[in-house]
């Protein structure tokens, strides 16, 4: 996941200045020998970028599609509704500003929302952490990001039938459907 995020940062920088990750689809099946980016959609307030990694034989080894949006309102100003948590607690983690800074330095994700005193945890940083935490060498995920997670927030991951749900307190922040 981290090498896909690193390659994603090679995309045109205008897609990273204040834009937020609304969703992602990741397929990781084997190591990749070569990686390439492709902008599939570039509109005023939304963009889709694909990162594909080819295996030595030329087949698709891994792929990441990200759905980026430029919010109309400042992040964190829209009230979020608490909800009943479903599923069994799988794992939890509190991201530090140093972890976010390390991720940004490694991937090259220079988005301003991941910097400052109270940065937002990058969505792909959380996905990469979860992949490592679950010791997954292969995966097929569709991730929908619902609300931001900030440095210092305790992120709790719950497993339900066919999906993982992430919460900060009783606020659902993202859902991963296992494809």
For each feature predicted by the language model, list its residue ranges:
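Active-site helix/loop of acyl-thioester processing domains in fatty-acid/polyketide metabolism
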Residues: 1-32, 110-112, 119-138
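A contiguous, surface-exposed recognition patch within enzymatic or periplasmic domains that forms
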Residues: 85-119
